[in-house]
Amino acid sequence: MTNHSSKILVIESPNKVKTIKKYLTDDYEIVATVGHIRDLPKYTLGFNTEDFVPKWEIIQEKKPAKGVSATKKAKTVKKAVKNKKEIIDELVDKAKKADEIYLATDPDREGEAISWHVYDVLKEKGVNVNKCKRIIFNEISEKAVKNAIANPREIQKDWVSSQITRRRLDRLIGFKLSSLMKSKINADSAGRVQSIALKFITEREELINKFVPRFWWTLDVILKDGTELMLRKIDEKLKDKLGFKELEEVSGIDFNTKEDAELVKQHLSDKYRVYAIDTPKLKSSYPKEVYKTSTLQQDAINKLKWRSMKITSVAQELYEGVTIDDEQIALISYPRTDSTRLSPEYGKTVLDFVAKTYGKDYVATQSQLNGETKANKKQKAKVQDAHEAIHPIDISITPDSVKNKISSDQYSLYKLIWTRTVAHYMAAAVYELVNIRFINNNNKFYAVNNTLKFDGYKKIYTHYDDKDHLRKLDLNHFAIDKEFEAKDVLLNEHQTKPPARFTQATLIEALETEGIGRPSTYSTILDIVLKRNYAELVNGRYYKTTDLGQKLAFELDKNFPTIINKEFTKNMETTLDEIAQGTVNDVSYLQAFWNDFSEVLNEAKTNIVKKVEYIEGKNCPNCSSQLVRREGRYGPFVGCSNFPKCKFIEKSEQKAKEIVYEEGVKCELCHAKLIRRVAKKKGRNKDNTFLGCSNFPKCKYTKSLEPEKDETIRDSTII
């Protein structure tokens, strides 16, 4: 009888097990850690500020929240995965019997740290860790998995050190600032990155409040044939005669007063003569780079109208694997990356697909693929580039081929990624521009003919691309010295717009541009400022700071200007990269930071004065102390000034409501549960109900109920 060796493959997500298993032989067993297995203690710093040695703890299972119904508790327990202790016990038991242990956690620094934690725990439990091998793959395909197993490596200790340094820095700043701000202004948290995001939102709000619009006028002509003319140059004699003092000539002329524009209008005749037709110029429009995490987030927010957390969730599903024709298949590569790089081998596969599907004329040139803009070069200096851009694993699996085999959300996001990837390897679109120049009493105008000569990548990307501003004129209609009559001469008023509030897409763009945050943290950053009531979404889209957010941003900016700023965060990311490369010592860096930070922290404890707003004539019914206004996570409230000795809170007039969660449906914007609500105005439902997002008022998604629909209630609890 032949003894077969046994092997263990350790991954993070249990959702990957079925997808990976089909590429392995029967002697492999897959064990999922379900994310991190150890972390710093939840309620203490977790290390001293002398040697910074972390005190790791096994992550404890979360307890059900207070007020959750017995039914919901039972369902929670029934659906719960194994706790971390059970996972570790199972892993240790299997590892002791295994001949080889492959640590296949995610291919980034956090994944490297999880592998190290597994390695360290196994070592503590007496497992022979010489059996451990670190492997990585950026996509779950047969080729990638088998290639990774064939090329194992050691755990990158410097990567682990960099990740643990980030964790300790965030703990230092988060714990110390959060404790201070909680005691002074009742703000729940003040993390390093979330505070920068809040600073961006607050500064933008200040610019909006200070904004003073500037007005200007343009003189626009519409000929009887519908051709639109733009004023390009005013007769010099007329300009001198009328005494224009402020004129700005760009592509056209802007008048600073309506009176100036009116004076020029009065000196125009009805006839506009063509005096020149320019030689046609060709202009190319190139496809954008393949997606990285930030650009996928921005595009899906803008084009699919999704929230950031939903994008992260659906992308993870496509990466871990979906069931298609009874087979588990991963559709995209690792979705957390700051790289736009793809391998030449993969690129050739896509180029061949383009040639076969659309024709050789649609294949991108090599010079086009090798080209880099100045912006790209500047941005790449901030990129870790640990793995490739987000792309379909098999480009031949078209969106249409899986449309009816995966969920509508999965299809929408896969189509977005697939289209962007294929478009990148397609030829540029080519436009032809011709300027037709007119003259009227020595005042010069022009019209533009802008037509698409070759669609190139727009053949597949038009649905997602910004609309082309094409102006198609019949060039045969125009000839030198031919005159045209005006239908209308319009004086149009314009005004500058205030800076736009951040959306989730533009906030991600701003954070990335400044080198703040990582691909794995964008959605969390955007979500936490809403959850903490530091900002709200206006019209479900635009970030606006709340009163609490403004107070927090003000105190942080006033007392921690050297910490809560983009330069510190950028420099910190650079140092973390250097630690990952082994050129900077982590403890020395942490010690230097703590020496400076602790000094500023002590000053802030003295400088920040806790403001209390007493309510005249109102006393606590329990202890007779005066009532005060306070700011909480869910907004302002009235409570006892003798807190925490007395915990009286004045109840609002709103009565407790029963929350009924709808079975089997989620919010299309943020993926939260939907709740049955009662409309104020009568609709066609007899009981006047509709579905609304449980994340209201942060998310205002609603969905109507059919009159005859009687859905099963999932959960019911009183709040």
Curated annotation (Swiss-Prot):
Keyword line: DNA-binding, Isomerase, Magnesium, Metal-binding, Repeat, Topoisomerase, Zinc, Zinc-finger
Cofactors that this protein relies on: Mg(2+)
Reactions catalysed: ATP-independent breakage of single-stranded DNA, followed by passage and rejoining
Gene Ontology CC terms: chromosome
GO annotation (BP), single: DNA topological change
Membrane-crossing residue ranges in chain numbering: none
Site positions for Interaction with DNA: 36, 166-167, 170, 336, 532
Domain Toprim: start-end pairs: 6-137
Any Pfam family: Topoisom_bac
Active site residues according to the UniProt entry: 334 (o-(5'-phospho-dna)-tyrosine intermediate)
GO-annotated molecular function: DNA binding; DNA topoisomerase type I (single strand cut, ATP-independent) activity; zinc ion binding
Topo IA-type catalytic domain ranges (all copies): 156-601
Binding site for Mg(2+): 12, 106
Region feature (Interaction with DNA): 189-194
Functional note: Releases the supercoiling and torsional tension of DNA, which is introduced during the DNA replication and transcription, by transiently cleaving and rejoining one strand of the DNA duplex. Introduces a single-strand break via transesterification at a target site in duplex DNA. The scissile phosphodiester is attacked by the catalytic tyrosine of the enzyme, resulting in the formation of a DNA-(5'-phosphotyrosyl)-enzyme intermediate and the expulsion of a 3'-OH DNA strand. The free DNA strand then undergoes passage around the unbroken strand, thus removing DNA supercoils.
Family of the protein in this entry: Belongs to the type IA topoisomerase family.
Subunit details: Monomer.
Protein name in the entry: DNA topoisomerase 1
Organism: Mycoplasmoides gallisepticum (strain R(low / passage 15 / clone 2)) (Mycoplasma gallisepticum)
